[in-house]
UniProtKB/Swiss-Prot annotation:
Asparaginyl endopeptidase able to cleave almost all peptide bonds on the carboxyl side of Asn residues, except at the NH2 terminus or second position or with N-glycosylated Asn. Responsible for the maturation (circular permutation) of concanavalin A from its precursor, by performing both cleavage and cleavage-coupled transpeptidation to form conA. Disulfide bonds join C233-C247, C411-C441, C423-C458. This is Legumain. Residues 1-15 form the signal peptide. One of its GO terms (cellular component) is vacuole. Belongs to the peptidase C13 family. The active site is at H158, C200. Its EC number is 3.4.22.34.
Length: 475
């Protein structure tokens, strides 16, 4: 039965360019000279941990190497990653991380700015704001940018309606993140900013709450109500090397990076990359096992050249500004099922290790059991609050485009804490239910009523280690 469930679920100060010699060579007659781009800064965030989430840290390490090749200085790139992959006992190439089946090592040289327990929302916010006094642990590196500087932020992980995951609780909540961006803008700490987000329902982080006047442009891997996808996975085309049991990358993430690596970024615009990534992430506009790449904020920035944010690699001088040669169709797995795919691969490859195979089967069983518990509990809570006739329509209601997930974000956090207190931790899978909690708030249910429903729905359930006392609250 478990097997059936699994198969079904299945400084940059690059400015003042010291590179004027080759800049002048590649400058086209019709292109204006732009030697004054300010300092390029970047924040790269892998919001997960565990070998089954290999792909998120691989994405971030790959992004770091791309920026370094583009001339962005290490001192101006801040990296958040748990750093439990490269030397993980399951990694077939110790000390090496790859983001493509035939790709090079992307781990070497990546700075350990914020790792392990230091990968937190609080540190992320402090880094973006350039507030060293609020940073706890880590290298202490922050985005100490000026009004003429440009900032690039890339985030790769699991997500849910209104939230982005972190390896250490709580989640990143949309309104908190937007508030940080508003503060950064108010401080005059940058000229323009570009943000790329890889996560399920990542459009919900910005839908209805992202202002257009912050000089910030955003693209997300998915809209406000759909999954994003892992790729380069075992058993798929193209597959990772045979010894790998986990996905190497994420569809949106590898799409933008492989696009940047194969084009002249002094000639390719932000808009051209958006169009290319949108097509590839949709699986050639079929949206069959693909997602809708969205854009938010100040879309005037899309006319700018990508080198202003990613830098420029001299090796790409003769590359085209844009073409459609990247692989258009990829086999993928949705982010939430990638965990099961990883465990199933481990199970299948343990035929000659009966004890290990039994242990992995127990892990799969517990994972599926907790997922079923979360799904069933949320549905039962809806029935208790609204009755069997209205429950589903209320919990799963999607607001019109342009409206935020929830009107009261404090209420959302409160409802999440009530649920986790009585029903156990949401985990990276349970993020999918954030819309239901938001709709509970939007419908005016009191905290007391929610508490009664959670007690009734989850009374007697033993979540084992998956309680907030062990994992921390998601809000």
């Amino acid at each position: 039965m478990v097997m059936m469930l699994v198969m079904l679920s299945l400084h940059g100060t690059a400015a003042r360019l010291n590179r004027r010699e080759w800049d002048s060579v590649i400058q086209l007659p019709t292109e204006p000279v732009d030697d004054e781009v300010g300092t390029r800064w970047a924040v790269l965030v892998a919001g997960s941990n565990g070998y089954g989430n290999y792909r998120h840290q691989a994405d971030v390490c790959h992004a770091y190497q791309l920026l370094i090749k583009g001339g962005v200085k290490e001192e101006n790139i801040v990296v958040f990653m748990y750093d439990d992959i490269a030397y993980n006992a399951m990694n077939p190439r110790p000390g090496v991380i790859i983001n493509h089946p035939q790709g090079p090592d992307v781990y070497a040289g990546v700075p350990k700015d914020y790792t392990g327990e230091d990968v937190t929302p609080e540190n992320l916010y402090a880094v973006i704001l350039g507030d060293k006094s609020k940073v706890k642990g880590g290298s202490g590196k922050v985005i100490n940018s000026n009004p003429e500087d440009r900032i690039f932020i890339f985030y790769s992980d699991h997500g849910g309606p209104g939230v982005l995951g972190m390896p250490n609780a709580p989640f990143v909540y949309a309104m908190d993140f937007i508030d940080v961006l508003k503060k950064k803008h108010a401080s005059g700490g940058y000229k323009e900013m570009v943000i790329y987000i890889e996560a399920c329902e990542s459009g919900s982080i910005f839908e209805g709450i992202m202002p257009k006047d912050l000089n910030i442009y955003v693209t997300t891997a998915s809209n406000a109500q759909e999954n994003s996808f892992g790729t380069y996975c075992p058993g798929m085309n193209p597959p990772p090397p045979e010894e790998y049991v986990t996905c190497l990358g994420d569809l949106y993430s590898v799409s933008w990076m492989e696009d940047s690596e194969t084009h002249n970024l002094k000639r390719e615009t932000v808009q051209q990359q958006y169009q290319s990534v949108r097509k590839r992430t949709s699986n050639s506009n079929s949206y069959r096992f693909g997602s809708h790449v969205m854009q938010y904020g100040d879309t005037n920035i899309t006319a700018e050249k990508l080198y202003l944010y990613h830098g420029f690699d001299p090796a790409t001088v003769n590359f085209p500004p844009h073409n459609g040669n990247l692989e258009a169709k990829m086999e993928v797995v949705n982010q939430r099922d990638a965990e099961l795919l990883f465990m199933w691969q481990m199970y299948q490859r343990s035929n000659h290790q009966p004890e290990k195979k039994t242990h992995i089967l127990e892990q799969i069983t517990e994972t599926v059991k907790h997922r079923n518990h979360l799904d069933g509990s949320v549905e039962l809570i809806g029935v208790l609050l609204y009755g069997p006739g209205k429950s589903s329509s209320v919990l799963h209601s999607v607001r019109a485009p342009g409206l935020p997930l929830v009107d009261d974000w404090t209420c959302l956090k409160s409802m999440v804490r009530v649920f986790e207190t009585h029903c156990g931790s949401l985990t990276q899978y349970g993020m999918k239910h954030m819309r239901a909690f938001g709709n509970v708030c939007n419908s005016g249910v009191s905290k007391a009523s929610m508490e009664e429903a959670c007690k009734a729905a989850c009374g007697g359930y033993d979540a084992g280690l998956l309680y907030p006392s062990n994992t921390g609250y998601s809000a």
